[in-house]
Structure formats: structure tokens, C-alpha cells
Amino acid sequence: DRDKLERSLNVALRKRPVQAEQIEQLVSRITRQLESLGETEIPSSTVGDFIMKALKSVDEVAYVRYASVYKDFRHTGDFARFLGDEGLDEN
């Protein structure tokens, strides 16, 4: 669902320096990638992986925000491990 995809990206990118046009481009790119799989039903985990990859290339803060929900972080240690695993703990 394109609208749900756009809402997810908007939540992650809220108050970040990313223009509405960039978000629309992300939605289009992810939608094309998902359609290219040729499947009628796509697991939410696959959609989440595509969103994570797109966000990482655009805004690391939005990437971590999305990951915190998608990967169900419960404690600060979850954030720390994720940041370390992704090599994002140095800045």
C-alpha cells in the first residue's frame, strides 16, 4: 500500500532536513523495487528491509528511528547494539 509506505517514511523523516519531493522519490523507488519482485503478496519484513535501506541512504537519524520500531527496540542497549552493528556509533 503506497499510502502506508509514505506514512511510514513521513513518520521516520519528521523534522528532518528532507524535502517532500525526496520522500515521494523514495516512495516511488521502493514501490518499483517491490513490484519488480513479481509477487502478489510481499512479507512485511521484505517491505521493512527496503524501507531501511532507502532511509539509510537518505538520513541516518530517520534510519535509526524507523529501525527502533521495525526491530522493536525495548531498551537503550538495543539502540547501542544496533548503532554499533551498523557502524553508526562513532559520530
Question: Would you name each region that the model predicts?
Answer:
Residues 1-91:
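Long, C-terminal-biased catalytic regions of enzyme "large/alpha" subunits
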